[in-house]
């Protein structure tokens, strides 16, 4: 080996024998000083010429051994790197395992809190529904009692009159009988005409039962689909949305009420020309607003929006329940439909003046086939089944509910805002192009 290290001297035969350590199996008296690259074995010098390895590529065995040593060292290096990779993989998998366990526990804790919140909301809803029934029952019973008391008073009057008439009929003195009859005649004539029959109007709680029946059916309809399928649909839907930040969130559904129930609170609010932008035009009945080419001339009202194509209704609601509809078929690529306080800023195009971008307003927005719910700058993505043509807006002022429905889509629920309203609410619109109308409701 020392001779091989010099690199310039050809190894001697004895060194080759010592290096190889064994003789040729075919020519046993000769040293196996060569290495057959094809057969991968050591041979003597005669084998490539006369033996079984005739014509095979060969080289010095010691040189092949040095090359093999280098290959072995390279293999050891690669094995060490690969072993470290597997060790790193195990570490990452163990870290991911711990994170997954922690995430699973935190998710279950979150779910427990949400279901507790849901139960509390259901309990509160049940209490409110029962309170509604009790309140209306007491009001109706009070009316019934007043009607019954009135009937009893009439009975007492008629009983008294009956006694007096009987006494008159039994009076033996003709003069006294005539005088008594004459004094009572007018009252007798008044009481002899038959009174009206009283038929108490029964109080029905079917609308309440129908509403909560629809709620239960909507929940049951959703839960009939296996949970894994619902979650998969939700994940796929949200992953297709680049703006989504919470893939896997469950979809909120709300029951769709019958339109006939909402029409009990129907309103047809008219629009206020003093609030609309100068580029907007109002129809004669003040129910349709459209974009114009030029601004209107004349004095500028102080209530007018001077930068945004917005308009408020003349009518406002500060108590009770109200329902109106908005037709957006001709509104083009973009529109905003909602409600706002009169304190909404009218000057400039800042967030304080934009519908839905402040605490004074709530709205649904459509632009470029995307739908959003906006309030105070916070937005929620909406995914209606079809493009919206007409919206229904329901306001329950005391309950703090402002809900939106797809009228042409079977009154499917779009979004509900919940708030404690502090000022009267005005229906509000904003246009991008085209026209928006408020239909007359029956």
Curated annotation (Swiss-Prot):
Keywords: Coiled coil, Cytoplasmic vesicle, Immunity, Innate immunity, Membrane, Metal-binding, Mitochondrion, Mitochondrion outer membrane, Nucleus, Ubl conjugation, Zinc, Zinc-finger
Domain B30.2/SPRY stretches: 249-442
One CC-aspect GO term: nucleus
Primary localization class, coarse: mitochondrion
PROSITE patterns: B302_SPRY, ZF_BBOX
Zn finger (B box-type) start-end: 19-61
Record has Zinc as a keyword: yes
Subcellular localization: Mitochondrion outer membrane; Cytoplasmic vesicle, Phagosome; Nucleus
Modification after translation, per record: Ubiquitinated. Undergoes 'Lys-63'-linked polyubiquitination; this modification allows IKBKG/NEMO recruitment to MAVS. Undergoes 'Lys-48'-linked polyubiquitination by RNF125; this modification mediates its degradation via the ubiquitin-proteasome pathway.
Induction statement: By interferons alpha and gamma in a STAT1-dependent way.
Coiled-coil ranges (or none): 76-109, 135-156
Tissues with expression: Highest expression in liver; undetectable in skeletal muscle.
Gene Ontology terms for molecular function: molecular adaptor activity; transcription coactivator activity; ubiquitin protein ligase activity; zinc ion binding
GO term, biological process aspect, one: negative regulation of viral transcription
Positions with a binding annotation for Zn(2+): 24, 27, 47, 53
Quaternary structure and partners: Interacts with MAVS. Interacts with WRNIP1 and PPP6C; these interactions positively regulate the RIGI signaling pathway. Interacts with CGAS; this interaction stabilizes CGAS and promotes type I interferon production. Interacts with USP14; this interaction mediates the cleavage of 'Lys-48'-linked ubiquitination of CGAS. Interacts with TBK1. Interacts with SPI1. Interacts with KDM4D and USP14.
Domain notes: The B-box zinc finger is responsible for inhibition of SPI1-mediated transcriptional activation.
Family, as annotated: Belongs to the TRIM/RBCC family.
PANTHER family hit by this protein: B-BOX DOMAIN CONTAINING, TRIPARTITE MOTIF CONTAINING 14
Function: Plays an essential role in the innate immune defense against viruses and bacteria. Promotes the 'Lys-48'-linked ubiquitination and subsequent degradation of hepatitis C virus NS5A leading to the inhibition of viral replication. Also plays a role in the inhibition of ebolavirus infection by enhancing IFN-beta and NF-kappa-B activation after binding to the viral protein NP.
Designated name of the protein: Tripartite motif-containing protein 14
Name of the gene encoding the protein in the UniProt record: TRIM14
